[in-house]
């Protein structure tokens, strides 16, 4: 009897383990090899060579999907598959999806007027153009405003409605992240839920997307035009849902009509260009849809600042996903057309074991450069544990302290309101977390990131030949990083430079410090 009970318990445990494993595997896309899905491994290797040589784009993750299967994927260390990533304007396509779902539930229509949703926030005088703005105009970035509301206060909806609508709605393209915010506000108004909460049972759960978060405005509304964080494979699933016309695992979770409507051409970014001129520029001039962009080769995409892309190629039944920090995001897409696209064939290719093995090795060993492991015992022993009191500065940092222990350097920062501790390793990335907000494209984001910390970070340090200490802090659930550069002299003084990777041209002046 005891043996029987023991075997029963073991069997149940095995069943539970298998069930959990199957459930976990069920949340992932199927994997295959490039050649089995009609793609050349050599084409992907050539792309990786070009990515390594590209000085304008720091690739952070990459995923290539063909016929619904992942055929290549890679993360440049310290980025990793399990990490979420700030998407910037790729978020807009998810806001568009929420609008599509709300339309299918008869909560709104494309022709609903903007002013009908916010009667209490309207300006005293409502112009004819403002009164005619429809949801479809906000989706296609053709509200008619010449300038965008700064939204630096606490009433973003009211601020947006106060900006004059100078052009007839639907006639003039003007990119506006605040128009996307207003779409988010509309969804929340008609559903009683934030966009992220509205999407969770309708989109995220069916696709097996877990752990999503989204920045929120001071009004308690998801920012809509930016601020969503998802993993790389989550983006691939989203792209595949659209590639499959809204169907997932045999179930229509998004209207096929909406997919076609949302991804078809609506307005030219520059109507004065000829077709030949548009093709000769880059993918930025192929036309705008409903919070999606048209792209070359009859493709379309969700994209975000600094090179966050979900490129959907229906004619090739393929998707390419990038997360990156790029100063040439359109050049990033050019690499797809130059290296990856020509390698996509109509039929499966013969297996190429050598190239396949080389590709697996390359993808598994991707890494961003780590600062070299250099030391300076003389200076580090003199400053370790001492406080550097800083002069008044834009970052409101009062003091810093450095401590060295073996191959680790700890940096403590004291601001007007908080204290933070960061750890950096020599010759490798030291992983950690912090509540300190990092670089962000939007100045208004200081108000948006409440509730998102702790942020995932990786730190490394080195001593340079000029005897300066350089600390590199990567925010690995974002694309940006910071550098802290310390220069010490013999008079117990220091100069500190703090450089944000997304604002190199706006570099702040050095901060003077006294070592005590």
Predicted regions and their residues:
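Peripheral terminal and inter-domain segments
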Residues: 354-516
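Active-site helix/loop module of the DD-peptidase/beta-lactamase fold
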Residues: 86, 105-143, 162, 193-226, ...
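Active-site Gly/Thr loop motif
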Residues: 260-320
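C-terminal motif of bacterial Sec signal peptides marking the signal peptidase cleavage site
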Residues: 18-19
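Active-site-proximal alpha-helical segments within enzyme catalytic domains
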Residues: 182-186, 226-247, 259, 308-325, ...
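Active-site SXXK
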Residues: 68, 85-111, 138, 183-187, ...
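A short, well-structured edge-of-sheet supersecondary motif
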Residues: 49-79, 317-320
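Structured C-terminal helix/loop/strand segments within mature extracytoplasmic catalytic/sensor domains
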Residues: 304-371
């Amino acid at each position: 009897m005891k043996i029987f009970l023991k075997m029963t318990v073991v069997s149940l445990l095995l069943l539970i383990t298998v069930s959990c494993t199957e459930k976990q595997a069920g949340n992932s896309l199927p994997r295959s090899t490039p050649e089995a899905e009609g793609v050349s491994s050599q084409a992907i290797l050539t792309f990786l060579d070009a990515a390594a040589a590209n000085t304008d784009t720091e690739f952070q993750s990459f995923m290539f999907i063909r016929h619904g299967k992942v055929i290549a994927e890679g993360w440049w260390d310290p980025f990793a598959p399990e990490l979420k990533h700030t998407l910037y304007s790729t978020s807009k396509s998810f806001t568009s999806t929420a609008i599509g779902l709300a339309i299918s539930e008869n909560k709104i229509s494309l022709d609903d007027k903007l002013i009908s949703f916010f009667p209490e926030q309207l300006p005293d005088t409502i112009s004819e153009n403002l009164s005619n703005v429809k949801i479809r105009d906000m989706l296609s970035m053709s509200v008619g405003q010449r300038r965008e509301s700064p939204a630096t206060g606490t009433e973003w909806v009211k601020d947006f409605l106060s900006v004059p609508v100078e052009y007839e709605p639907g006639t003039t393209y003007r990119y506006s992240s605040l128009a996307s915010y207003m779409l988010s506000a509309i969804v929340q108004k008609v559903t009683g839920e934030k966009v992220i909460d509205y999407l969770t049972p309708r989109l995220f759960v069916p696709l097996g997307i877990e752990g999503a978060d989204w920045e929120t405005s001071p009004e308690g509304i998801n920012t809509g035009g930016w601020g969503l964080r998802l993993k790389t494979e989550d983006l691939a699933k989203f792209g595949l849902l659209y590639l499959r016309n809204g169907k997932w695992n045999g179930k229509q979770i998004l209207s096929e009509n909406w997919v076609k409507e949302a991804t078809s051409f609506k307005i030219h970014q520059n109507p004065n260009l000829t077709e030949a001129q548009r093709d000769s520029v880059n993918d930025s001039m192929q036309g705008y849809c409903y919070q999606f962009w048209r792209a070359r080769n009859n493709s379309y995409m969700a994209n975000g600042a600094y090179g966050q892309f979900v490129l959907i190629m229906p004619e090739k039944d393929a998707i390419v996903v990038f997360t990156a920090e790029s100063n040439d995001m359109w050049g990033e897409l050019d690499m797809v057309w130059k290296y990856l696209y020509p390698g996509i064939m109509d039929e499966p290719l013969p297996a190429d074991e050598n190239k396949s093995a080389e590709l697996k090795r390359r993808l598994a060993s991707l890494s961003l450069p780590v600062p070299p492991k250099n030391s300076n015992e003389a200076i580090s022993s003199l400053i370790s544990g001492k406080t550097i009191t800083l002069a008044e500065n834009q970052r409101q940092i009062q003091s810093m302290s450095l401590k060295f222990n073996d191959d680790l350097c700890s940096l403590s920062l004291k601001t007007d309101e908080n204290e933070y501790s960061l750890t950096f390793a020599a010759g490798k990335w030291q992983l950690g977390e912090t509540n300190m907000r990092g670089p962000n494209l939007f100045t208004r984001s200081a108000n948006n990131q409440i509730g998102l910390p702790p942020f995932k970070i990786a730190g490394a340090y080195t001593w340079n030949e000029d005897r300066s200490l350089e600390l590199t802090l990567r925010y690995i659930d974002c694309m940006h990083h910071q550098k802290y550069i310390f220069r010490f002299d013999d008079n117990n003084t220091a100069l500190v430079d703090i450089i944000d990777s997304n604002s190199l041209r706006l570099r702040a002046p050095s901060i003077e410090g006294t070592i005590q």
